[in-house]
Amino acid sequence: MPREKGRKVVASNRKARHDYSILDTYEAGMALTGTEVKSLRAGRASLVDAFAQERNGELYLHGMHIPEYVQGTWTNHEPRRTRKLLLNRIEIDRLIGKTRESGLTIVPLQVYFSDGWAKVEIGVAKGKKSYDKRQDLAKRDAQREIARAAGRRGKGMAD
């Protein structure tokens, strides 16, 4: 069976973009078992409470939930197991260096298939304070209101 081309998003972490300001993003592969890949292809995954952490010079993804494959047998995987992230050595060293700075962490933003390979987009993030979240919400509401007004003006409806 040939691999499909393009990018098919399986799961995205919307809460990460709300709780953190993303400074930089990277694309990483994941070391997965066969049943994990099949479960991902079925569109079943959750990135809630997931994070990446350094151990022995490698990066590992903790807390990502991939449910057991429905048609799997005794070879099924553990849903919340730690998964190794596959990156170049230079990228790993750069990420480890950034996380050693105060207040920075690595969070997964989305899981997707790129040309048939399971990938995770990870971001170097800094936690937002509650007032930052309120400011972002106010900005988003203002942008939405501007777009709504522009849409009315384009349709010939005046306020």
Swiss-Prot record:
Disulfide bonds listed in the record: none
Keyword Lyase recorded: no
GO cellular component, as recorded: cytosol
Any GO BP annotation: trans-translation
InterPro entries xref list: SmpB, SsrA-bd_prot, SsrA-bd_prot_CS
Any matching Pfam family: SmpB
Principal subcellular localization: cytoplasm
Gene3D superfamilies according to UniProt: 2.40.280.10
The entry's keywords: Cytoplasm, RNA-binding
Subcellular location as annotated: Cytoplasm
GO molecular function: RNA binding
Family note: Belongs to the SmpB family.
Physiological role: Required for rescue of stalled ribosomes mediated by trans-translation. Binds to transfer-messenger RNA (tmRNA), required for stable association of tmRNA with ribosomes. tmRNA and SmpB together mimic tRNA shape, replacing the anticodon stem-loop with SmpB. tmRNA is encoded by the ssrA gene; the 2 termini fold to resemble tRNA(Ala) and it encodes a 'tag peptide', a short internal open reading frame. During trans-translation Ala-aminoacylated tmRNA acts like a tRNA, entering the A-site of stalled ribosomes, displacing the stalled mRNA.
Record protein name field: SsrA-binding protein
Annotated organism of origin: Salinispora tropica (strain ATCC BAA-916 / DSM 44818 / JCM 13857 / NBRC 105044 / CNB-440)
Protein's gene: smpB
